[in-house]
């Protein structure tokens, strides 16, 4: 919005030309989302407390979590608000990639909101019925994926980038839709599973978004894209603004979500952020890179799959409790230790992922 306005005002004052610089807009996008998040935090927490929108804690969970019962949840609303406002202010409104991310972000946020509402109002720990949750997540993911396929088939937009192999970029064709679906839905659920400890999900999300901001910048720059042997996508540059908005909103939320948390993001935040990371990876053709940089999310999800599969097939559990962060809690690790160590692992994985762009 402000970019469009600045383009009309630059003829009256050349200083408005600064709004055309991607790096400037990336920085102010981050700061805008950060300040909105920090401003909304106390007000959102007070409002959620007044409405008695408190966290519902399972009775079979770790005993240390019982003290979290009643902590305000659905704080993801402030994350989404900060991201959407910042992106609308600083990104080019005509960019289709930006709107793809916003559709998934808001759509998954609405699904998460309904899920949270059922939990906190009806005191139902299961929330929205699983089949309906996956149905609407699938509708959004398939809708966006199919639209992207129709717009970009037989172009670099539907190629698969394989880490370590610069000349291996198979054209996916219609399989692009299927891959995009699994990446978007899978990442949404993976972040949701990770959101079980104070600050555990938000910081890896910030790290991955920051990593994708660098990838988006390189992908949208023809010289750097050719240098790194990745597809050049002319619309990709504006995803930098989206990624930095996620970073800013995430850091602002962490101010209130750090241990001991004053507020939880709820499904409205975790599903939306996961879906956003998924669609960003799809748009940048970096699905494999997401698996590396988002390794914490992958491990959390695999721990649940292995736990359920092992119990059904052998009648035995692999972990003391899944997702795996609860396993370490039950081993006696203090919650802050689990959180910070997962953060460190996440940062390392993002750096490794970025390194794979050059090691090809």
Curated annotation (Swiss-Prot):
<comment type="pathway">
    <text>Cell wall biogenesis; peptidoglycan biosynthesis.</text>
</comment>
<keyword id="KW-0132">Cell division</keyword>
<feature type="transmembrane region" description="Helical">
    <location>
        <begin position="236"/>
        <end position="256"/>
    </location>
</feature>
<keyword id="KW-0808">Transferase</keyword>
<feature type="transmembrane region" description="Helical">
    <location>
        <begin position="263"/>
        <end position="283"/>
    </location>
</feature>
<feature type="transmembrane region" description="Helical">
    <location>
        <begin position="338"/>
        <end position="358"/>
    </location>
</feature>
<keyword id="KW-0997">Cell inner membrane</keyword>
<keyword id="KW-0479">Metal-binding</keyword>
<dbReference type="GO" id="GO:0051301">
    <property type="term" value="P:cell division"/>
</dbReference>
<keyword id="KW-0460">Magnesium</keyword>
<dbReference type="GO" id="GO:0009252">
    <property type="term" value="P:peptidoglycan biosynthetic process"/>
</dbReference>
<feature type="transmembrane region" description="Helical">
    <location>
        <begin position="94"/>
        <end position="114"/>
    </location>
</feature>
<dbReference type="GO" id="GO:0005886">
    <property type="term" value="C:plasma membrane"/>
</dbReference>
<dbReference type="GO" id="GO:0008963">
    <property type="term" value="F:phospho-N-acetylmuramoyl-pentapeptide-transferase activity"/>
</dbReference>
<dbReference type="InterPro" id="IPR003524">
    <property type="entry name" value="PNAcMuramoyl-5peptid_Trfase"/>
</dbReference>
<feature type="transmembrane region" description="Helical">
    <location>
        <begin position="132"/>
        <end position="152"/>
    </location>
</feature>
<feature type="transmembrane region" description="Helical">
    <location>
        <begin position="168"/>
        <end position="188"/>
    </location>
</feature>
<dbReference type="InterPro" id="IPR000715">
    <property type="entry name" value="Glycosyl_transferase_4"/>
</dbReference>
<keyword id="KW-1133">Transmembrane helix</keyword>
<comment type="similarity">
    <text>Belongs to the glycosyltransferase 4 family. MraY subfamily.</text>
</comment>
<protein>
    <recommendedName>
        <fullName>Phospho-N-acetylmuramoyl-pentapeptide-transferase</fullName>
        <ecNumber>2.7.8.13</ecNumber>
    </recommendedName>
</protein>
<keyword id="KW-0812">Transmembrane</keyword>
<keyword id="KW-1003">Cell membrane</keyword>
<keyword id="KW-0472">Membrane</keyword>
<keyword id="KW-0961">Cell wall biogenesis/degradation</keyword>
<dbReference type="GO" id="GO:0071555">
    <property type="term" value="P:cell wall organization"/>
</dbReference>
<feature type="transmembrane region" description="Helical">
    <location>
        <begin position="72"/>
        <end position="92"/>
    </location>
</feature>
<dbReference type="Pfam" id="PF00953">
    <property type="entry name" value="Glycos_transf_4"/>
</dbReference>
<dbReference type="GO" id="GO:0051992">
    <property type="term" value="F:UDP-N-acetylmuramoyl-L-alanyl-D-glutamyl-meso-2,6-diaminopimelyl-D-alanyl-D-alanine:undecaprenyl-phosphate transferase activity"/>
</dbReference>
<keyword id="KW-0131">Cell cycle</keyword>
<feature type="transmembrane region" description="Helical">
    <location>
        <begin position="199"/>
        <end position="219"/>
    </location>
</feature>
<dbReference type="InterPro" id="IPR018480">
    <property type="entry name" value="PNAcMuramoyl-5peptid_Trfase_CS"/>
</dbReference>
<keyword id="KW-0573">Peptidoglycan synthesis</keyword>
<feature type="transmembrane region" description="Helical">
    <location>
        <begin position="26"/>
        <end position="46"/>
    </location>
</feature>
<comment type="function">
    <text>Catalyzes the initial step of the lipid cycle reactions in the biosynthesis of the cell wall peptidoglycan: transfers peptidoglycan precursor phospho-MurNAc-pentapeptide from UDP-MurNAc-pentapeptide onto the lipid carrier undecaprenyl phosphate, yielding undecaprenyl-pyrophosphoryl-MurNAc-pentapeptide, known as lipid I.</text>
</comment>
<dbReference type="Pfam" id="PF10555">
    <property type="entry name" value="MraY_sig1"/>
</dbReference>
<feature type="transmembrane region" description="Helical">
    <location>
        <begin position="288"/>
        <end position="308"/>
    </location>
</feature>
<dbReference type="GO" id="GO:0046872">
    <property type="term" value="F:metal ion binding"/>
</dbReference>
<dbReference type="GO" id="GO:0008360">
    <property type="term" value="P:regulation of cell shape"/>
</dbReference>
<keyword id="KW-0133">Cell shape</keyword>
